[in-house]
Amino acid sequence: MTGIGLRRIRRYSMEDTVSVRLFSDSHLYRTGSLKWTGITTASGEPTIGAWVAEMDFATAPEVADAMKGAIDDGLLGYQPTWLEPRIAGATAEFQKRRFGWDVDASQVRLVASVLPALEATIDHLVRPGVPIIVPTPAYMPFLTIPGKFDHPVIEVPSLRGTRALGRGWALDLEGIRAGLEAGAGLVILCNPWNPVGRVLREDELRALHDVVSDYDALVFSDEIHSSLVLDEQVPFVSYASLGPSFASHTVTATAASKGWNIAGLPSAQVILPDEALRERWDVFAADMRHDANVIGTLGAIAAYERGEAWQREVKDLIRSNVDLVERALADTPIDFVRPEGTYLTWWGFEGVDLGPLSPAATLRERARIAANEGRTLGADYASWARINLACAPDVASRIVEGVLGLL
């Protein structure tokens, strides 16, 4: 029974190479891609889609085959009874094989996506009304979701120019401690870090633990981009993997949605190694698994079990785009730090005279590039913009040309 919906998967060895299928502009416009048609210029002219966190690539053939097989098998109703155990096992095995984290399948819970998991954590596990700490710049919903549950947000702007990281970004641990002293009950961690592209090192995670452990607080660790580490010299380390004292205060959320470009089919996994925290979760979240999409979950299983060869090629494409941008911006006043992970990149325009418009508005109106407004990722970042580089090489070139044309 557990093979249903997966029977069409091609079997690749780790040495196999697959071809990544890139979508053309015309295809993306014709299909009404939100990324490419959701933002136009003020006069209605089309833009280059660089704002939504998805890739301009077809998903892995293994994933597509699994989803097509599920449709052929009629798996369009409610979740089959074997689905949650199967995704739990695939998630645990992937975490162990890819990152060395020895997760047991019994510690994995199926949810629709990372954001509902965050909402459930805030609503049910955090003390009512206490502040939520968000290191910034941050994924936009992290700054808005706490307010839906009557929790104020404490933004902690991150540090630049540390000795260890050069121009890279680092958590402001003293700022986080100050927020915890003020009564905060949760720290939202994003690793790899959207939008700055940092992959946090083990010593950074241990230093964060030393701060959080002094207080009655939890960590929500969003690891949705963990499979997209671009710098092969930087290992990904999950915060909760570092020991029982880490796991005891951590809700870890991950998914295949970003790494295999299936975000429109909601399916994510919460990992809870700590038994006491897992029991608290199960009291209120037992039914959350029903919100996960069956087709998306089967796609995630295929991604975790058979999708790594395809993803290696995807990361090569993204790295090539990053190389292009890094070279092009090297002698310009634009602040760009090469991402260690994720295809989302963070561009600073503080040293550029763009006139009265924000960077994102200027990019849209003058370069016809749709990017994210920096101020939506943190109050201190009005002079920044987030740009997605998971695109065809020619699109990356056009983004660079458009940006350089503003100088």
Name each model feature, range by range:
Residues I301, I318-E326, F336-F349, Y381:
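Conserved glycine-rich beta-strand-loop-beta hairpin in the small C-terminal domain of fold type I
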Residues E15-S113, A120, A303-R306, L407:
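N-terminal small-domain helix-loop-helix segment of the aminotransferase-like
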Residues K68, R177-E181, H209, S213-D216, ...:
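A structural alpha-helix within SAM-dependent methyltransferase catalytic domains
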Residues R8, E93, R177, D353-G355, ...:
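PLP-dependent enzyme catalytic core of the Aspartate aminotransferase-like
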Residues F149, D214-Y215, F246, T332, ...:
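Helix C-cap/helix->beta junction micro-motif
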Residues P244-R319, L407:
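Conserved core segment of the aminotransferase class I/II
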Residues L76-D210, S227-L228, V234-S245, V251:
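Conserved core of the PLP fold type I
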